[in-house]
Amino acid sequence: MAHSDWGYDSPNGPZEWVKLYPIANGNNQSPIDIKTSETKHDTSLKPFSVSYDPATAKEIVNVGHSFQVKFEDSDNRSVLKDGPLPGSYRLVQFHFHWGSTDDYGSEHTVDGVKYSAELHLVHWNSSKYSSFDEASSQADGLAILGVLMKVGEANPKLQKVLDALNEVKTKGKKAPFKNFDPSSLLPSSPDYWTYSGSLTHPPLYESVTWIVCKENISISSQQLSQFRSLLSNVEGGKAVPIQHNNRPPQPLKGRTVRAFF
């Protein structure tokens, strides 16, 4: 989904996306600021459950605006279910968002509080659709698990991912990434917020059931700087580090954010 017609800096930063992707001003855009006093405690919600098979981890790819760890998604070996979801959602990739400083790199904020980075685990509705591409534009097509990251102690669970970044320094590079269980990156608390939203970068489809974990995970300043050392240029081009790739919070426009605590 990496296109040179959009980015995170002017002249084609987030405020300009609407020119090419009118849905950027839609009613269900993400991320949002989660105002905890306005969330609705919903007793019908269940804890979400993940079952990830480490053998489905496949490769790591520099997509120009971030990097993705991709998973084999031809069967239901790695799935997210329960919580607010009607069926099984299959893991296709995870990626991170970060900022040019340690203070602010998250996409979601909580009561206006910004976090250092954010992990997104992207899943598609395999109970109803036959591929990520088919599901990605459908209202019930995707589920993304969001985990806020706070600068502090180094997180040893991130090390395997960080160690692989040298192999995908420039845009378009990919390398094998095997035997990894991303549930190791999740916080221990089952608490979450959920709402209807969108992909946070073009094509910005309003197809996402968001599950944002209430508890954050740690990342050190040094680990964060490794994200920023990735390059958005192809090999041989002028080195342009990916300094930041976080879209600002979007208007809620009457949506309800439900809480499972």
Curated annotation (Swiss-Prot):
Residues forming the catalytic site: 65
Species lineage: Eukaryota, Metazoa, Chordata, Craniata, Vertebrata
Keyword Zinc assigned: yes
Protein name: Carbonic anhydrase 1
Gene Ontology molecular function: carbonate dehydratase activity; cyanamide hydratase activity; zinc ion binding
Organism, scientific name: Equus caballus (Horse)
UniProt family annotation: Belongs to the alpha-carbonic anhydrase family.
Any GO CC annotation of this UniProt entry: cytoplasm
Domain of life: Eukaryota
